[in-house]
Amino acid sequence: MIDTVTLPPSMPELHAIVAMASNRVIGRDGKLPWHLPEDLKFFKRTTLGHPILMGRNTYESIGRPLPGRKNVVLSSTMPATEGLDVIRDVTEVAQVCQGAEKVFVIGGARLFADLLPLCSQLYLTWIDEPYEGDVLLPPFEHLFEQIDTLSSGEGYEFRLYRRKV
């Protein structure tokens, strides 16, 4: 777990964004276990123009830097890569994202486990059925309260959560 005391005061606000099936699954074999174009559009619309922070496995599953966003990868083993800011410690986010109002944490599970307690908001695509998978979203309900359902469609909702005070 990351110690909140070590975060610099200049740290941008952290927001998390993730899609989760009803059984907490968020991934399978390095991919999303569902095909939901509306979720991909929501992700793009929400994160465009903002830095995104991810772990190495998440970056490797995407396979390339996402356009229109500063891509930051937190990894102790990944070498410097063109088009990315590779950092070794979460406190480096303040430096590489200097001037950013917020940074979106986009995964994976280990990064969510470490950083959800530090996030002020969570954008969750709730998928109203279980999926088989090998990556689960850690429990967050004790940290956040739902404040809005931004929109919904058949079998899914885009929910906004705020960290409990």
Name each model-derived stretch.
Residues 1-13, 164-165:
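Short, low-complexity, intrinsically disordered N-terminal peptides in bacterial proteins
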Residues 14-51, 56-165:
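Flexible, gly/pro- and Lys/Arg-enriched active-site loops
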